[in-house]
């Protein structure tokens, strides 16, 4: 049997991809408790096609507008009011519109950890604001399940934090 070659040249002692269950999210410098799912870290660049009048057979393609999908955060319902408090900055019953134009946009930080609990990758998501908030998942007396709270965040882009470098595997 041949010895197994390292699959990841930047960290040769690592053989397996990172798992999807070891992560944390923070905003305002605080980790948000109980988040169980993060989805929507997606960037799409549109295609602009054009054709020259003398070219009969092909069109040219160039990059168009780039859009960033909403980020969806889900967590088991707890007594922590972070989702609700942020949503109330955007719109609060009785106030009629934005309650705080200064504070309703926030940058969030999504951190990924390896099996040893070491930070290996992070993403900065810019100028997020809640566009949808679901304080309770479906209530059903016939099912034993955890209640889920959901927050959909619009954003103006994200980037990988390149200052986060995976530690050497030993």
Residue ranges of predicted features:
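Glycine-rich, low-complexity intrinsically disordered segments
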Residues: 2-170
């Amino acid at each position: 049997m041949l010895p197994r070659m390292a699959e990841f040249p930047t960290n040769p002692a690592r053989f397996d991809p990172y798992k999807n269950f070891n992560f944390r999210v923070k905003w305002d410098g605080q980790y948000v408790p109980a988040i169980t799912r993060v989805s929507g870290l997606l960037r799409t660049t549109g295609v602009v096609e054009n054709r020259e009048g003398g070219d009969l057979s092909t069109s040219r393609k160039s990059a168009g507008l780039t859009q960033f999908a909403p980020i969806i955060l889900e967590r088991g319902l707890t007594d922590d009011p972070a989702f609700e408090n942020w949503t109330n900055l955007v719109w609060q019953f009785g106030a009629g519109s934005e309650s705080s134009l200064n504070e309703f946009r926030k940058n969030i930080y999504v951190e990924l950890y390896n099996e040893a609990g070491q930070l290996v990758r992070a993403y900065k998501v810019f100028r997020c604001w809640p566009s949808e908030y679901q304080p309770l998942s479906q209530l059903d007396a016939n099912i034993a399940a955890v209640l889920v709270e959901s927050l959909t965040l619009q954003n103006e882009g994200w980037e990988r934090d390149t200052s986060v470098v995976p530690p050497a595997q030993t």
